[in-house]
A protein has these predicted regions:
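Interface amphipathic segments
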Residues: 1-468, 475-480, 485-599, 633-684
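Short edge-strand/loop segments of extracellular domains
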Residues: 627-633
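Short, solvent-exposed loop/turn segments enriched in Ser/Thr/Gly
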Residues: 604-606
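Acidic/polar loop patches that form or flank catalytic/metal-binding clefts of enzymes
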Residues: 550, 618-622
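Short solvent-exposed strand-capping/beta-turn motif centered on an Asx-Ser/Thr pair
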Residues: 614-616
Length: 684
């Protein structure tokens, strides 16, 4: 036998009946008993949607147990009822005074002692009316143990209570306070209760989740829960390495709808939380998660947070991530989603992350973030220009953050460095390894595009810089170092054009751009006014954009040109002073460097050439060159203050001659005599 949505293998009806025709139709009365075997719902499993929609949630074991119990109860069962029915014309009524359902699975349901169900037809508006006076109980076979008590209300409709024992399944437990409800004559049933839930989550569980519940069941069976805000509390929650302690918040229906609804469209509804604030641990480290607003949908199992802020680790120097938008979804694998407008900082590291966007996931106790970001200097004014990464990947697992990415110059896309970061949330210690495979400076990429500190110091660079560095941090202490090198670079420096610059630079404070003493730069040529070649400069980079020149040496015109020790300040646009010492300059060789073909000279010079370099270029201020008299020792000067030069009239210093062509017709006698004198001048 099959009728509507219910089928049975065998149905028996016994009893007595009376029938008599009347002017309005047929009067009939039946008193009897009905029994049916193997009752089952026809068509698809009506609870299949419940199983799928709760998968991975704390109530999943309860939903599975309930669905399995209903399925098992439908395989081998028997239903019995005693009833009486009366029909007068087109109206009728029936009263069921005893009914029970039993299954081989152990499931039982039935009317309580002295209870009855009354049916009448047609009710106002058509259809079938019903009323229960007494109780209905369920138990066994995996079904919840429950008792429903109803009574007719004087004004119509029903009122009653539902008592349900705590329902458990594989680590899940649902407890309901007595459900109080009332049903109107139109078929709408309203109810109130409170739930307390314990249940498993991936790698953890929720414990003591409590929520007052108010809802209704429509005439078509649609269930609606909590159309208004209600206080949600929980004792603890653990999801992988994410854990919360005691938490309280107001849970409101999203967009004015119900918090939860279940009907022909399946499980729907959504929640909204204003001013979210959660405190707990992530990966064993302290965690605070806050947001201006949070929303979640039960239908799509998605959620989003607006202006979310995540703090991890030591509250005094936490890992900080702030996202204007964080969206995600939950599935059997865990959580995943997208983020945008994200900013962040790790502890006290003077590096800031901004404009980050990409994808994130949380599964198997591992948080992973992949996307793009901009890295800037936390110092003001900034020491380096912003860099971008389009392949940044961050992972948090077991209280350890690891991150990798390529840092690019944003305008040209040139690779500046590859970074590899490790940070321990528990201790607050970590390090960032920087690998600079080779930054090639061209007309498109210049040093000032990477750091403003290069402005006014170097320009028109052509060459490659490569090296490695490391930044380390622990508590409030940040240290860094690195070694970088270049070979055969050309550039325009503050003291003139430079070609063939080569050397290695060892930083003792990479972030502060401080080097070890006695760094060596080899220079093929430099031209502060006169070109000199094959120089060696020893120097040290100091804090606050200071450069200490320890020495500079060049072979120069048969002698030696030395740059005296000095400290130059590049922190501001102001004149910079250097002093070059000349020892043993050969006059003839020097004239050759000036390309003066018609001049010949002999002699040796010593001296000191103080120079000032500013926006006008370089110039000598107060310099001294002394023609060394033959037979005298070199004059080695450190300054020109109170300088006194002695001269022995008996000793010569050198000769100067004009060796160019002269036209006798144009000069005349006295002109010829003058140029004859210029052909061999002695000086001292």
């Amino acid at each position: 036998v099959q009728r509507g949505d219910i089928r049975s293998a065998r149905t028996e009806l016994t009893g007595a009946f009376q029938m008599a025709p009347t002017p309005d139709g047929m009067d009939a009365r039946i008193d009897g008993a009905l029994s049916a075997n193997r009752l089952a719902m026809a068509g698809p499993d009506p609870l299949a949607g419940l199983r799928a929609s709760t998968a991975g949630s704390p109530v999943a074991p309860l939903a599975i147990r309930f669905a399995d119990a209903v399925r098992a109860a439908s395989r081998d069962n028997r239903a019995q009822a005693r009833f009486s029915m009366a029909q007068k014309g087109s109206t009728g009524s029936a009263t069921i005074t005893a009914a029970d359902f039993t299954s081989r699975s152990g499931a039982r349901a039935g009317l309580g002692q002295g209870s009855s169900v009354k049916l009448d037809w047609p009710k106002a508006g058509g259809g079938l009316g019903w009323a229960l006076n007494g109780s209905v109980t369920t138990d066994g076979g995996g079904l919840p143990r429950a008792a429903l008590r109803l009574a007719q209300r004087p004004g119509g409709g029903l009122a009653g209570q539902l008592f349900v024992d705590p329902y458990t399944a594989r680590g899940a437990r649902l407890a309901l306070e007595p459900v109080r409800f009332s049903a109107g004559a139109g078929g709408m049933t309203r109810f109130t209760t409170a739930i307390r839930l314990d249940g498993p989550l991936d790698g953890g569980a929720v414990r003591g989740l409590a929520l007052p519940v108010a809802g209704q069941v429509a005439a078509n069976g649609t269930l609606t829960v909590n159309p208004r805000c209600a206080p949600l509390t929980l004792d603890s929650l653990k999801f992988g390495s994410f854990a919360l302690g005691t938490t309280r918040m107001a849970l409101c229906p999203d967009s004015g709808n119900a918090l939860l609804a279940y009907g022909p469209q399946g499980l729907t509804g959504g929640a909204a939380i204003e001013a979210l604030r959660l405190k707990g641990t992530l990966g064993g480290s302290a965690m605070t998660l806050s947001a201006d607003a949070a929303r979640g949908s039960l239908a799509t199992r998605t959620f989003d947070l607006r202006n979310a802020l995540l703090l991890l680790g030591d509250p005094a120097a936490p890992v900080r991530l702030n996202a204007t938008m964080l969206a995600g979804k939950m599935d059997a694998k865990g959580l995943s989603g997208t983020m945008a407008g994200t900013r962040g900082r790790i502890g006290t590291i003077p590096l800031l992350v901004g404009d980050a966007a990409g994808k994130w996931s949380y599964a198997a106790s591992t948080l992973r973030v992949d996307g793009a970001l901009t890295l800037t200097d936390a110092a003001a004014p900034n020491r380096f220009e912003p860099l971008v990464s389009r392949d940044f990947a961050l992972t948090l697992r077991n209280s350890q953050i690891t991150a990798k990415g390529s840092l690019l110059e944003p305008k040209t896309g040139a690779l500046v460095a590859r970074t590899d970061i490790v940070h321990q949330l528990g201790s607050g210690k970590g390090q960032a390894d920087l690998d600079v495979p080779g930054v090639a400076f061209t007309s498109a990429l210049q040093p000032e595009m990477l750091t403003r500190l290069a402005l006014g110091v170097v320009a028109n660079a052509r060459g490659t810089v490569a090296g490695k560095g490391q930044i380390r941090w622990a508590d409030d202490t940040v240290t860094s170092d690195g070694t970088f090198h270049t070979d055969n670079m050309d550039l325009a420096a503050a003291f003139g054009p430079v070609t063939g610059l080569s050397g290695e630079l060892r930083f003792t404070d990479l972030i502060g751009l401080v080097s070890a003493p006695s760094q060596i730069a080899r220079i093929k040529t430099v031209n502060p006014g006169v070109e000199v070649t094959d120089g060696v400069v020893r120097y040290q980079l100091l804090a606050n954009q200071q450069v200490r020149v320890e020495s500079g040496e060049w072979p120069f015109a048969g002698g030696q040109l030395s740059l005296l020790p000095t400290t130059m300040d590049f922190s501001a646009d102001k004149p910079r002073n250097m002093a070059f010492r000349v020892v043993g300059l050969d006059a003839g060789a020097f004239i050759q460097t000036l390309d003066l073909d018609n001049i010949s000279a002999t002699g040796t010079y010593d001296g000191l050439l103080p120079m000032v370099f500013d926006e006008k270029g370089g110039r000598i201020v107060g310099g001294v060159l002394v023609a060394r008299q033959i037979g005298r020792a070199p004059l080695v000067l450190a300054n020109t203050e109170s300088l006194s030069i002695t001269c022995d009239p008996a000793l010569q210093s050198g000769t100067l001659a004009y060796v160019g062509p002269v036209s006798n017709e144009q000069l005349g006698v006295f002109g010829k005599m003058a140029f004859d004198a210029l052909k061999h001048l002695q000086y001292k």
